[in-house]
């Protein structure tokens, strides 16, 4: 499998090193924005720069042709602002520890179900599905600390990400993590609008809980599979909103 086929980076460490140099904003951010200090995801810069360049071109058009260009300029400004909102990447802190499975994505819980997971866990697992709308933060995070043992891309369809069949049929990237409490699988799933999954992961790599996993561009879903044998209690319900790196999805029982 070639990394270019699915956006899985073979240069994840260099991307993370460059990403660490991007400064945070220095002012408090409202909750709807994502909470905490915020920076832009590196993958978003080409889109944001292009969006604002078009908005600037529209402003020039207004200056040259007058009010007839106002509708176009307003539309371009709306798109430019939305691109900044979409690619925001808030700094997140929350509960940490090997007994917790933390949300890997912002969004709404659309499904909690026990399913068979044959790819990595090869056992019954509780699947917790998070749907991200185009207004949610789309940077994904590791739900637990551990070592990456599996990295697999599967091409597929582009059904609506909230649909039940999306977990099986849509384009997706799966990351299997060996944690202190056993194996855990997290799956990035493309949606109706999303056409690009980026996963900064390498087999054998050690990752921290809440570290950056990647991003899915323009509306998507993330599933977490927790082995039933691990005796983890689910702490969220369908319809609940969660935040990546902050919300506890499941907690291992003593």
What kind of feature is each model-predicted range?
Residues 1-30:
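Short, basic, low-complexity termini and linkers enriched in Ser/Thr/Gly/Pro
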């Amino acid at each position: 499998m070639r990394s270019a086929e699915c956006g899985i980076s073979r240069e994840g460490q260099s991307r993370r090193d460059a990403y660490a140099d991007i400064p945070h904003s220095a002012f408090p951010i409202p909750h709807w924005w994502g909470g905490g200090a915020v920076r832009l995801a590196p993958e978003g810069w080409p889109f944001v720069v292009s969006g604002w360049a078009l908005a600037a071109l529209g402003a020039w058009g207004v200056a040259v042709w007058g009010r007839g260009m106002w509708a176009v300029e307003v539309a371009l400004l709306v798109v430019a602002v939305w691109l900044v909102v979409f690619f925001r990447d808030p700094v997140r802190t929350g509960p940490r520890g090997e007994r917790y499975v933390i949300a890997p994505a912002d969004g709404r819980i659309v499904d909690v179900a026990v399913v068979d997971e044959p790819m990595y866990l090869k056992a019954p697992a509780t699947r917790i599905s998070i749907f991200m709308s185009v207004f949610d933060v789309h940077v994904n995070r590791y739900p637990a600390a551990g070592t990456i043992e599996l990295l697999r891309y599967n091409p597929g369809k582009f059904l609506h990400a909230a649909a039940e069949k999306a977990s099986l049929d849509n384009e997706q990237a799966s990351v299997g993590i060996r944690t202190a409490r056993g194996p855990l699988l997290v799956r990035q799933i493309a949606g109706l609008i999303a056409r690009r999954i980026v996963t900064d992961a390498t087999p054998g790599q050690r990752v921290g809980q809440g570290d950056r996993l990647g991003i899915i561009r323009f509306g998507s879903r993330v599933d977490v599979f927790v082995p039933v044998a691990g005796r983890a209690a689910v702490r969220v319900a369908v319809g609940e909103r969660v935040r990546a790196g902050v919300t506890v999805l499941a907690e291992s029982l003593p």
